[in-house]
């Protein structure tokens, strides 16, 4: 009998009888058959709602080797526990991995380090990295990069540069382009943009080649932080070095142009990305909408909004945060009303404050029935519960 089965038969599992039966069936089947019903066991973990039971189910499921190979279920479980503020249980399920032979494999350990980093638990990530030699697990650029990523994702920006300078020489690790890219991201995070840009030359001096990720980090940092001229210089260097620009490169520049009210140049750049056979995504259209809204060109902004769905994308709430207040301010209450109805009909996300702004505008514009309808839709829909006031605050 497998250890999983013995555990369950002892009666220590604190779930409901129905849940016990389902979990027992899945785990014993996983242990007894050559081809385990993987989706069933994963589903049992994913479908659980109680953080305590998520933790217990996950730990027991980890006894199946194939389950430990599933990256997605680890990421989802850690994310859900962190969202519930149960960081002690994040630590519990990741510490549980120490009992398995996977922890002697660098790829698996790098995953654990990254998972800690994604939820801001850098000290735990550092501990896992430091303990690798005890498990006869060699540390290379793979785990080093995971540690750097954990540091950046945990927003420990002041520590990134020190780790980068200290560990490679100490552990005989040769940083690669991915290492430098993470360092660049960390420097940008602490506001050291000039030092981050200077690393392009250092990368090349090391015999490495900056890639599109290197430049995309710098493009995003410059264009989104109001450093338009610096962004244009980075873009020019990218072209000069013949680094292929992807949709993220174009999106960053489009946003920069939008913030500078350069709608004509935005349209020209959009045509270029299409000419380069790149597929625009929702962020592309969000930037276009933002630019036209900023210039007060609402008809054009609405036209670009309609392009989102035509291109197989779903609008993000940032689109409505930009578009709806502008439409209300322009006095086009009918369009604002219709757009709100579309949001609920298509189950799209929007901030409650933006919806309230529309309701207030409708009431002030003597469109009481329309305002009441939006309030009712916000109250009765089954995916986005909002408590809207029918009358504006005085």
Swiss-Prot record:
Annotated PROSITE patterns: PPR
Keywords: Mitochondrion, Repeat, Ribonucleoprotein, Ribosomal protein, Transit peptide
Lineage: superkingdom: Eukaryota
PPR repeat segments: 105-139, 140-170, 176-210, 211-245, 246-280, 281-315, 316-350, 351-385
Range of the transit peptide: 1-24
InterPro entries per record: Mito_RNA_Proc_CCM1, Pentatricopeptide_rpt, TPR-like_helical_dom_sf
Signal peptide start-end: none
Primary localization class, coarse: mitochondrion
Family matches, as Pfam families: PPR, PPR_2
Keyword Mitochondrion appears in the UniProt entry: yes
Claim: Transit peptide is one of the keywords in the record: yes
Localisation: Mitochondrion
Family that this chain belongs to: Belongs to the PPR family. P subfamily.
PANTHER family linked to this entry: PENTATRICOPEPTIDE REPEAT-CONTAINING PROTEIN PET309, MITOCHONDRIAL (PTHR47934), SMALL RIBOSOMAL SUBUNIT PROTEIN MS78 (RPPR3A) (PTHR47934:SF26)
Complex formation: Component of the mitochondrial ribosome small subunit.
Identification of the protein by name: Small ribosomal subunit protein mS79 (rPPR3b)
Species per Swiss-Prot/TrEMBL record: Arabidopsis thaliana (Mouse-ear cress)
